[in-house]
């Protein structure tokens, strides 16, 4: 990054988009999001599904990166279909930051299928085989099968979902007795 005078986002964008399908390499995915969850850049060569409209699953580490600005965070993410990905995320600042104007803080997520973990330097301290380290994620709340998710913000579109107005939880879509 410093050798070529590029930003973290530029490096992530380049390793994702400058791949030649005829040459071996790691198929990455990359996304950029703001703190409100809006995805403003998405590329997926790894096969992970990135939502086209709305935000992604709040369990993706691209969102938790906002809790530790500037620090690269690595995670093992497991989709509802069983596919595993290793993902890194880090915040970046955009804008000039003149007096009276704030800079924009964005988060950049970069990842690949877990089978490439040994070739991805940021995952050397992750135990890919340890199921306890896996973070269960989905694409987005409206398409996710994880009905017991404590971070569910919307009911699933593809399943009947009963809301009990007499039950209190972290959200009207989550019962505290079933949340994980």
Explain the meaning of each model-derived region.
Residues 1-147, 151-180:
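Conserved binding/catalytic microenvironments
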């Amino acid at each position: 990054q410093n050798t070529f005078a590029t930003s973290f986002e530029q490096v992530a964008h380049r390793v994702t988009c400058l791949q030649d399908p005829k040459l071996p390499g790691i198929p990455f995915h990359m996304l950029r999001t703001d703190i409100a969850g809006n995805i403003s850049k998405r590329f997926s060569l790894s096969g992970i599904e990135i939502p086209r409209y709305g935000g992604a699953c709040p369990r993706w580490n691209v969102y938790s990166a906002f809790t530790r600005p500037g620090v690269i965070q690595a995670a093992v993410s497991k989709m509802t279909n069983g596919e595993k990905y290793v993902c890194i995320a880090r915040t970046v600042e955009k804008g000039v930051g003149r007096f009276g104007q704030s800079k924009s803080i964005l988060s950049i997520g970069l990842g690949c299928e877990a089978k490439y973990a040994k070739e991805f330097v940021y995952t050397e301290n992750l135990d890919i085989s340890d199921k306890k380290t896996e973070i269960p994620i989905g694409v987005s709340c409206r398409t996710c099968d994880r009905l017991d998710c404590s971070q569910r913000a919307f009911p699933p579109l593809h399943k009947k979902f009963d809301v009990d107005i007499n039950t209190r939880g972290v959200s009207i879509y989550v019962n505290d007795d079933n949340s994980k």
